[in-house]
């Protein structure tokens, strides 16, 4: 009887202590040089977005955005793609790596829409090969970096096909797909993106964004963002969206408004502003920064505040646009990663099914 009472008490404490706030991803925008990785992480990001430039034949060359880019940003920062992946592997991939618990997701904006059609499959093959050989190779399974492969348009589907086929070729066990997600980033119609995923046989790990450059984001209609959130929050067959993000958001008023809508992530040039808003009384009871314990592919439905449906006709005030990037780096406390307690379907097999895996069993 005493043992039963103790067990019931322990279960009650576990349920009571469970944190049901939405895990939120603060994605640093245009992190295209190696020094910028640590800069953005020290400023509060838990994910980074990088732009990948390809040669005409589909070879991934470097991280680079170029002109034009966001207001008040330098557009020409870059790094060799292999050096970039190896750096991230070194600072995240092992138990006592400097950012092993801080950097949760690398969002790769694959600049492939202008490639010749015959080069798009090759681009997927090449970026996946470089990920396997230079980011994931030799890294323990639970420490492997999560990567979001973002193409511009649904018409770029061949890139994802090439990447998927290549990863399967390297890893017939399909375990690496637990660390891979997908996105279509340039505001295509959602129904077209849904059809693309159906053709690919992908039914999990799908992020979906909406937005525009920070120079114009305050003029953008919220209708597509609302539609994207509704895709996540319904269970219809075409409702493919697992995570919703908005880009590129720098002003505090717009950050607040976007979080009220129930997004899972914001891409920003000003991460300290986003983390500051997350600490405000209105939000800190319902939203929190994501940690390594959170599954970046898990779908969570909206819990908007009472102000979540307010009118959007008001324009955001001009905030302080002083740079946040003049600072002295400081050391971050280190502690080992631990495995996630559960995992959602992650792997496409040859029958276009993404099987469930037992989270208690090793994947390697």
From Swiss-Prot:
State whether keyword Lipid metabolism applies.
yes
**One MF term in the entry's GO annotations:** toxin activity
**Cofactors (names):** Mg(2+)
Q: Which residues form the active site?
A: 29, 65
**Record localization:** Secreted
**Primary location:** secreted
User: Where is it found, in Gene Ontology cellular component terms?
Assistant: extracellular region
Q: One biological-process term from Gene Ontology? A: killing of cells of another organism
Residues crossing the lipid bilayer are: none
What tissue specificity is annotated for this entry?
Expressed in salivary glands.
Q: Show the catalytic activity.
A: an N-(acyl)-sphingosylphosphocholine = an N-(acyl)-sphingosyl-1,3-cyclic phosphate + choline; an N-(acyl)-sphingosylphosphoethanolamine = an N-(acyl)-sphingosyl-1,3-cyclic phosphate + ethanolamine; a 1-acyl-sn-glycero-3-phosphocholine = a 1-acyl-sn-glycero-2,3-cyclic phosphate + choline; a 1-acyl-sn-glycero-3-phosphoethanolamine = a 1-acyl-sn-glycero-2,3-cyclic phosphate + ethanolamine
- Which keywords accompany this UniProt record? Cytolysis, Dermonecrotic toxin, Disulfide bond, Hemolysis, Lipid degradation, Lipid metabolism, Lyase, Magnesium, Metal-binding, Secreted, Signal, Toxin, Zymogen
Give the co-factor note.
Binds 1 Mg(2+) ion per subunit.
| Signal peptide positions (record) | 1-17
Superkingdom classification of source: Eukaryota
Function summary: Dermonecrotic toxins cleave the phosphodiester linkage between the phosphate and headgroup of certain phospholipids (sphingolipid and lysolipid substrates), forming an alcohol (often choline) and a cyclic phosphate. Acts on sphingomyelin (SM). It may also act on ceramide phosphoethanolamine (CPE), lysophosphatidylcholine (LPC) and lysophosphatidylethanolamine (LPE), but not on lysophosphatidylserine (LPS), and lysophosphatidylglycerol (LPG). It acts by transphosphatidylation, releasing exclusively cyclic phosphate products as second products.
UniProt-recorded name of the protein: Dermonecrotic toxin SPH
Give me the gene this protein comes from.
SPH
């Amino acid at each position: 009887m005493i043992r039963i009472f103790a067990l019931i008490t322990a279960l009650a404490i576990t349920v009571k202590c469970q944190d049901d706030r939405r895990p939120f991803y603060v994605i640093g925008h245009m992190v295209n040089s190696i020094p910028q990785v640590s800069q953005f992480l020290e400023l509060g990001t838990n994910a980074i977005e990088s732009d990948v430039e390809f040669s005409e034949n589909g070879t991934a060359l470097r991280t680079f955005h170029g002109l034009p880019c966001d207001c008040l940003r330098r557009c020409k920062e870059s790094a060799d793609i292999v050096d970039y992946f190896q750096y991230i592997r070194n600072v995240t991939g092992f138990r006592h790596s400097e950012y092993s618990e801080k950097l949760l997701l690398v969002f790769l904006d694959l600049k492939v829409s202008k490639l010749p059609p015959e080069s798009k499959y090759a681009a997927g093959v090449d970026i996946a090969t470089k990920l396997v050989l230079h980011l994931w190779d030799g890294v323990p399974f639970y420490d492997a970096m999560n990567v979001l492969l973002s193409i511009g348009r649904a018409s770029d589907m061949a890139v994802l096909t090439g990447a998927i086929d290549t990863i399967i070729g390297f890893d017939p066990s399909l375990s690496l797909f637990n660390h891979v997600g997908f996105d279509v980033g340039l505001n295509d119609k959602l129904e077209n993106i849904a059809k693309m995923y159906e053709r690919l046989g992908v039914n999990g790990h799908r992020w979906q964004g909406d937005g525009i450059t920070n120079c114009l984001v305050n003029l953008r209609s919220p209708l597509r963002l609302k539609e994207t959130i509704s895709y996540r929050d319904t269970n219809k067959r075409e409702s493919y969206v697992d995570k919703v993000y908005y880009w590129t958001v720098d002003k505090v008023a717009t950050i607040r408004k976007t979080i009220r809508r129930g997004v899972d992530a914001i891409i920003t040039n000003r991460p300290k502003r986003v983390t500051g808003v997350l600490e405000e009384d209105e939000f800190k009871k319902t939203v929190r920064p994501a940690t390594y314990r959170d599954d970046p592919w898990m779908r969570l439905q909206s819990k908007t505040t009472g102000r979540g449906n307010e009118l959007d006709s008001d324009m955001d005030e001009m905030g302080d646009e002083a740079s946040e990037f003049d600072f002295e780096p400081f050391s971050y406390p280190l502690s080992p990663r631990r495995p996630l307690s559960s995992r959602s379907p992650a792997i496409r097999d040859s029958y276009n099914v993404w099987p469930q895996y037992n989270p208690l069993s090793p994947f390697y």
